[in-house]
Amino acid sequence: MSAEIEYIRNVFRSGFELTDITWSSWDEPGRIGVEHHVLWAPDAEQGEDSVGLLLRFPPTAHGDFHEHTGYELMLVLDGQLDHSDGVSYFKGDLVVEGPGTEHRMSSSSGCTVLAIRTKPAEARTPSKPIREVTPAA
């Protein structure tokens, strides 16, 4: 098996300008409007659980509410990423969440994110209402 190299120029462009890569709808319960480009996927044969993704959130799109069984790193490449705890992250912000953290990510205005998970996440039901962020007028 030969090693693969994927090269994406100027990844800090808006995901909606990144037309040189293939985006797929991320269709899972609780996810609305999120698109992804898989950089690498888990490989059970190699004992590898990690996944690397580019995520594209159009305005008002959101992921599911979930708990992390490993670490998750999110680098906002463009736009505004909104966390269910009410904090918003912007282009250049790096967020690292540890095992046991729970959240639902969304975007009120649209964003592109590099996401790396060391282990899978598990869907959960939130124990308190999720704080929604509304777009600025």
Role assignments for model-derived ranges:
Residues D20, H36-H68, V87-S88, G98-E102:
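Conserved short histidine dyad/triad with adjacent acidic residue
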